[in-house]
Amino acid sequence: MILLKLYLTLAAILCQSRGMTSLDLDDLMTTNPEIQNEIINKHNDLRRTVDPPAKNMLKMSWDNIIAESAKRAALRCNYKEHTSIAERTIGGVVCGENHFMSSNPRTWSSSIQSWFDERNSFMFGFGPTIPGVMVGHYTQVVWYKSYKVGCAINLCPAQSLKYFQVCQYCPGGNVAGRKYEPYTIGEPCAACPKDCDNGLCTNPCAYNDDYTSCPDLTKQVGCNHPVTANCKASCQCTTEIQ
């Protein structure tokens, strides 16, 4: 009888525990400020832990306009393709995009951690250590220049993986030419000693260069030359992270 009572007590505790930890779509909606904070804090916590360390890693913040764009992407229920560049260009800035699909709802922290865990198959400056393995979600999560993020979730009942989570990052990462160097190696905040929050830089550049050659161009001909008219970041941001 004692064993039976003990068993029933344990079963009740387990059921309550499962009930408390179960999730539904409403629990993950990113219109909830608590969910927004969870997403931002998770990203920033992970960005602080990159190995090798980053000297120029920007601190991320939530952006509602980007979240609306991510929502439109999630509503498409298209797991296989990112939204077009035109659709994820916000305020003239091309944003990056990560997808996570699951058969059961997962916390945002869990999904973001899954993206970050691609680092286990990634070597800085080299890329995937296993041919064909995915590492682009990781490099986007830790792309130094991406400092605004917005995310959304949608239920896609026609799919076996029916929970579809999307995050968009601005400016986008995985830039050609340095895709496998998502940041500059160095002592945390070495590039922003006066604008640092626990290892993350807080001085993003509000402008963008239209050409990857802009830093060299501005050094050669200066910022008053017509050829550097589209090099606003290199010309306007002398102390900010760009």
From Swiss-Prot:
A single GO molecular function term of this UniProt record: toxin activity
Entry keywords, A to Z: Calcium channel impairing toxin, Disulfide bond, Ion channel impairing toxin, Neurotoxin, Potassium channel impairing toxin, Secreted, Signal, Toxin
Tissue specificity field: Expressed by the venom gland.
Subcellular compartments: Secreted
SUPFAM superfamilies for this protein: Crisp domain-like, PR-1-like
Pfam families noted in UniProt: CAP, Crisp
Family matches, as InterPro entries: Allrgn_V5/Tpx1_CS, CAP_dom, CAP_sf, Crisp-like_dom, CRISP-related, Cysteine_rich_secretory, SCP_CRISP, ShKT_dom
Annotated ranges, domain ShKT: 205-237
PANTHER family: CYSTEINE-RICH SECRETORY PROTEIN-RELATED (PTHR10334)
Family: Belongs to the CRISP family.
Function: Blocks ryanodine receptors, and potassium channels.
Name of the molecule in the record: Cysteine-rich venom protein VAR11
